[in-house]
Amino acid sequence: LLLGFEGVDIHSDIYYATRVYSTLLGSGMSSRLFQEIREKRGLVYSIYSSGDFFSDSGIFYVYAGTGHKEVKELIPVLCDQLNIDANTFTQEELTKTKAKFKVGILKAEESISSRCRSNASSYLMHNKLRSPEEFIAKIDAVQLEDLEKARTKILESNLTVSSIGPIENLETVDSIKRRLS
């Protein structure tokens, strides 16, 4: 199951907040989605949020690998998680998420192929090479209210739902959209 939303482009004032929000929400075993939906409720095999960001557009999505019987219970729980006001996240969660993000950036600098990809992407998107320190400074500047701006923008955008397998237990797109406030 995939819930897809309009994202932001790399020039957006909430680009970095969107990246941090996605990481906090659904990147790794400590993420909110993994803990609530997989560990606590056992509704999925895998769950994560991510995004793709370009110079003129972007997408934000949540992926859930689940069975057709579990999808009926999954949708309301997933929507509840997406509806949580990011201002209620703790400062500790934000700090840990930023640290996780920064470790990934710095680890990537140790790989020649990752560094080449990063430099090429930076040059293509920004017409200049950007240092990891520049990126880290932008991540460090993100605050909880910025995460809420990103979350609100995501949920107010158009929703696309994609599913593989039996869909008799899957709600309509309109029904899912109504659950997202």
Indicate residue ranges for each PLM-predicted region.
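Short beta-strand-to-loop capping motifs
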Residues: 5-7, 64-66, 163-167
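Short, conserved charged micro-motifs
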Residues: 12-14, 70-73, 169-173
